Regions:
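Redox-cofactor-proximal catalytic regions of oxidoreductases
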Residues: 63-89, 278
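Intrinsic-disorder-associated, low-complexity terminal segments enriched in Asp/Asn/His/Tyr and depleted
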Residues: 3-8, 17
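Low-complexity, intrinsically disordered short segments enriched for Gly/Pro and polybasic residues
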Residues: 1-3, 221
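Short, basic/glycine-rich phosphate-binding loops at helix/coil junctions
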Residues: 83-90, 254-255, 328
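A short acidic, glycine-rich active-site loop
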Residues: 93-95
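Flavin (primarily FAD) cofactor-binding/catalytic cores of flavoenzymes
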Residues: 18-36, 41-68, 98-374
Length: 374
């Protein structure tokens, strides 16, 4: 790790300005940042660079979600060279590897110390309301009054479980990615993984390799290879400007914000984890879960169309990469363009699955997350 930021204080977490405290009343400060994960810490750096007095209020510890709400084998989807925060960049021995969760925690914890972030941990924000020309922030440890509030509490606080989960037979265990740690915590027997984005495909792969038969329910998804023409797909998307697209450059911002995460996994082998890879090891592929009636899960018949659309969009991305490589003189430096086999779909994917016959013992809801502003 390398940092180029010199904090005002010696190495260690920052302290609040004593002048911000009003004896016997609310604490006063310019800006309150809610959350001390990587986003909140990055905001702290930027505020400090501009001389803005602030405090970070954290309900637990720094990087709490990484410490308590991630499964054991998870690695970042992005290579180490992309792991950077304002004033801190990765400078380890393997820029093309992918951080494990302990490494992410260490990275974020170290960053908090490097920038001397003024953090108040074990502080739960209970309400935020407008007061005059500022805000009042109530917590379990007192009240703050401030000019500005930054909500950096994350976008993955609550697992989005569809309402149809209430119709699942009581004999079947249900878990979300926030609860899941490893296959050993699951019951023996078949597992239905609902959702085929990054989380769903990774968990389907891990659970199936543990010896539990897995059925994967896939709706709309984003397929991309881990490596293309000898370089990581993230390198290509960074170089071509795909990652630089602004919110005001898209036709439908709401749709853009709800595009599924790509089917990617971070591994030392840099292998592609798409639906073909999963069916190749024996995972059963079915369509989007549409409902549950009388103990039977009902699936959409649009699996083939969804897979064809994902293949089409992937090839459009690869075309963009090929054009950029040619225009920038890289064709002689990297392997030639190629295309991947289309997603293999059974002639007649099943449209129903009996949840009462004992074949399915667990359902994993890999159906996304949502923020919690309550």
């Amino acid at each position: 790790l390398r940092h180029n930021y010199q904090p005002d204080q010696c190495h260690g977490r920052g302290q609040l300005n004593r002048q911000s405290v009003v004896s016997g009343g609310p604490l006063k400060i310019d800006t309150v940042v809610i959350g001390a994960g990587h986003s909140g810490l990055a905001m702290s750096y930027c505020l400090r660079e501009r001389g803005v007095e602030h405090v970070l209020l954290e309900r637990s510890d720094v990087a709490n979600s990484w410490k308590t709400e991630r499964w054991d084998s998870l690695r970042l989807l992005t290579p180490n060279w992309q792991s950077r925060l304002p004033g801190l960049t990765y400078e380890g021995d393997d820029p093309d590897d992918f951080m494990t969760i302990p490494e992410v925690i260490s990275f974020v914890d170290h960053y908090a110390d490097v920038i001397s972030a003024p953090i108040q941990t074990r502080t739960t924000v209970t309400s935020v309301c407008c007061v005059g020309d500022g805000y009042q922030v109530d917590t379990n440890r007192g009240t703050w009054k401030c000019r500005a509030v930054v909500v950096a509490s994350g976008a993955c606080n609550i697992a989005s479980v569809p309402a149809i989960a209430s119709s699942v037979p009581s004999s079947i265990a249900m878990v979300t990615p926030l609860d899941y740690r490893n296959p050993e915590q699951l019951k023996e027997g078949g597992v239905l993984v609902v959702g085929a984005s990054a989380t769903g495909t990774q968990l389907a792969d891990e659970i199936h390799r543990s010896g539990r038969p897995v059925t994967l329910s896939a709706g709309e998804h984003v397929r991309i290879p881990r490596v293309y023409r000898g370089r990581d797909i993230q390198w290509w998307m960074d170089a071509t400007g795909v990652l630089d697209e602004r919110y005001d450059e898209v036709d439908d911002i709401n749709r853009a914000r709800n595009v599924p995460s790509p089917q990617l996994a971070g591994s030392q082998e840099r292998s592609t984890l798409d639906l073909n890879a999963l069916t190749g090891i024996g995972v059963k592929l079915i369509g989007r879960l549409a409902g549950i009636r009388d103990g039977t899960a009902q699936f959409s018949g649009s699996l083939r169309n969804n897979c064809a659309l994902a293949d089409l969009k992937m090839n459009r991305l690869l075309n963009t990469i090929d054009e950029w490589a040619s225009e920038n003189g890289l064709d002689d430096q990297v392997p030639s363009p190629h295309r991947f086999a289309g997603t293999a779909v059974a002639d007649s994917p099943p449209l129903g699955l009996d949840l009462t016959d004992g074949q399915i013992q667990t359902i994993v809801w890999a159906t996304g997350y949502r923020p919690d502003y309550s």
